Amino acid sequence: MTKQTLTQLEQHDLFLRRHIGPDSNQQQAMLNFVGAESLEDLTAQIVPESIRLSQDLSIGDSCGEAEGIAYIRGLADQNQVFKSYIGMGYYGTQVPNVILRNVFENPGWYTAYTPYQPEIAQGRLEAILNFQQVSMDLTGLDLASASLLDEATAAAEAMALAKRVSKAKKANIFFVADDVFPQTLDVVKTRAECFGFEVVVGPANEAVNYELFGALFQYTNRFGQITDFTELFATLRAKNVIVTVAADIMSLVLLKSPGSMGADVVFGSAQRFGVPMGFGGPHAAFFVARDEHKRSMPGRIIGVSKDARGNRALRMAMQTREQHIRREKANSNICTAQILLANMASFYAVFHGPDGLKTIASRINRFADILAAGLQAKGVSLVNSTWFDTISIKGLDVAAVNARALAAEMNLRFDADGTVGVSLDETTLRTDIEALFDVILGADHGLDVAALDAQIVSQGSQSIPAALVRQDAILSHPTFNRYQSETEMMRYIKRLESKDLALNYSMISLGSCTMKLNAAVEMLPVSWPEFANMHPFSPLDQAKGYTQLIEELSTWLVNITGYDAVCIQPNSGAQGEYAGLLAIKKYHESRGDAHRNICLIPQSAHGTNPASAQLAGMQVVVTACDKQGNVDLEDLKTKAAEVAGNLSCIMITYPSTHGVYEESIREICDIVHQHGGQVYLDGANMNAQVGLTSPGFIGADVSHLNLHKTFAIPHGGGGPGMGPIGVKSHLAPFVAGHVVVKPGRESDHNGAVSAAPYGSAGILPISWMYIKLLGSQGLKKSTQTALLNANYVMKKLSEHYPVLFRGRNDRVAHECIIDLRPLKEASGVTEMDIAKRLNDYGFHAPTMSFPVAGTLMIEPTESESKVELDRFIDAMVSIRAEIAKVESGEWPVDNNPLHNAPHTMADIMDPEFDTRPYSREVAVFPSAAVRTNKFWPTVNRIDDVYGDRNLFCACVPLSDYE
């Protein structure tokens, strides 16, 4: 036996071997099958030589898990997590451990995908429905979305909705009260500029002086003041103004709802419902509107429908509003949202129940009363006369107070005009109030918390005016009143989890979604308090660990992409598209070319591309694709020439959405550049580029990167995501800035695209760990293995299904498209039938009907083993045999295992099942693998039409759950 070297024994590549699914023997067998000698040989056969990198990445060597954890622990320790009283939309919260352990840290929840296949997603759909119910109850409005990205972007969406639905069609002014959070105003101004709206900022009561299509107010405002807007809202609505309100979710537990005051739209952050601050995110935003505006709502909405048996079933409702269908005509470009965080917030409400939430909110308000009473007793002047949790103070020696605060390791809010703000939260204790007295007043103030509390109890408090105290009940549905013990809560979460298929059960081969392993070691640091509990507006010298992590990650991404700079701020891929297009737009404006507003987009593009272009104020011109799925160069040349004087950019995905490396990609870039345009290369398929080629090397100017695809952040059932953009040097001055945090970059003066300066910074440690552990060679091998897995699946399935597009040497890139249209024509079996039948085999369906209707797009990723790939292939082969029985007439078109899929326990218990032309075993145990490890769909096929015609988006009677 040959002795191993010490380097081999140290196993620095162990994580790589665990991340990549096929072991060396499996890889060789697969290479032999596809006809390649090695991964390098296969790469040479697939990737055009003209765009292949000649040098390896300069990330460094791979490292072991323990080494990686030790390094990032050192970064975490550099963060100084002071007690935060900054507020401004971000607050300390206590994450219930039953939720932390069973949801946030549970792959059954965080590795699932957006519930496009609702029959195998009923658990998280119920949790999201609960989130919508919480949102509706607290805001007093009719219809809630399943989550938006953050409060500031929700404000921008509210402005867009207001313009769509306002009857004041000639108005072009959107009014923003001057006491909203500054980051919200920043994002709204950025979006308004793209739309050509005028934003007027002023005192709330001056809104009536303008001809408006919409207006935005903060409740409670940035200084803590609570205002009764009832009369103002009535006046504005009489003038056809759409009234939108940014509201604090915890305050709404005690306060009169904005809906009851007359608001049309209410939104805000659900962060303080059990989601850590995370240096800015991720957090779910709630968004609620009147029923009359339902068709103009942004984002996903969960609705109640029925399945084939007539039983209650949940699904995503009114999808025809969304980008994947309406493209540039969509209400918004929202794709990935914040479902995992919305679920956490909904479980927080379920666990505490209405009484628990009232206790928490009342405690926060009582501490604010005590703080205010003590300060006023000592002659301190307050800016606000009413409050829920925030006290704003004037007349203090700001420098002295700040010095004492820093010495006590606390952060207060310091405004430019000398106002000092203190925002309390769920984590506030008596000792914190005592410490605040010391910091604000200095020593020997003589104030006693207990005495002040007794005074308030005996005399009462007017911090919340009687007219603004909530009178109506909230969360009266039984779901919010029966799970207050941890035992019941744990079982409820588990019961919902068991209804959903996630990566911890089987491969999810969704094309263009890159459902790879989200390793436990990558997830671990996200829960650490040093990362989780930092306020995004903390002084940067307290966030040295975060800033170093962001700088290192940015440097790696620059190297991987071939760009010159990276902006981390966008908190989804679609937001990254928007941010990248804004950089292009501002670049043209800086050169006196503001008229360049046409965006060329191939007809095969992701739906977010045209939606984002529209969002950035661009006009979309669609270019054709040829029969091989490539961009039609002649059509591109013609259209680029036709619009040359106004050409802004092209948006193109690489490898293409058809799953091939287009040989002409550099020529495409050259054509656009020759006509004065910029090249936006969509990073959705970056998993086929890393280490082999790069957007910058190809010739692109800007790309977004889906960190929740290529770089291992989990999809969370529909979010969180991160969409940082890489840019060439000439675009770097035009990426997003931030009004609150300015780290000293040339782009600081630009408007923001997200509420927090670094977006959802709390999940960046995942991608940092992924890159650190894999190193240069590991990243490259991951890409090569993704190519191997895709070509293995393609070649195996090509014996049974037509493969629609192939590139050079008859290869595909990291995904393949099988064409079901001939089978549908011959048998009547649809792509939907096949997708639902895969549920019976224990699989989530591949991407349906994108980029070509009547097809399935399969992306296996590098993390799936040959064993799992073969299981999926066997399922598809078995389904093909089932289709043959329909073709031959053995099974009727309208009564067969595909048409009736998915099958549930209720099916096999049904005495009438015997009338079907196939057995119970064929229905639910169609393969040997399923017999030993069965996933049971809990509902039959859902009636989409019924759900949209009978729209109901709230919790249903408890009897329907039982």
From Swiss-Prot:
Catalytic activity: N(6)-[(R)-lipoyl]-L-lysyl-[glycine-cleavage complex H protein] + glycine + H(+) = N(6)-[(R)-S(8)-aminomethyldihydrolipoyl]-L-lysyl-[glycine-cleavage complex H protein] + CO2
GO MF term (any one): pyridoxal phosphate binding
Oxidoreductase is among the record's keywords: yes
EC numbers for this chain: 1.4.4.2
The keyword Oxidoreductase is annotated on this UniProt entry: yes
Disulfide bonds: none
Keywords (A to Z) from UniProt: Oxidoreductase, Pyridoxal phosphate
BP GO annotations: glycine decarboxylation via glycine cleavage system
Superkingdom in the source lineage: Bacteria
Assembly and interaction partners: The glycine cleavage system is composed of four proteins: P, T, L and H.
Function text: The glycine cleavage system catalyzes the degradation of glycine. The P protein binds the alpha-amino group of glycine through its pyridoxal phosphate cofactor; CO(2) is released and the remaining methylamine moiety is then transferred to the lipoamide cofactor of the H protein.
Protein name: Glycine dehydrogenase (decarboxylating)
Gene (UniProt): gcvP
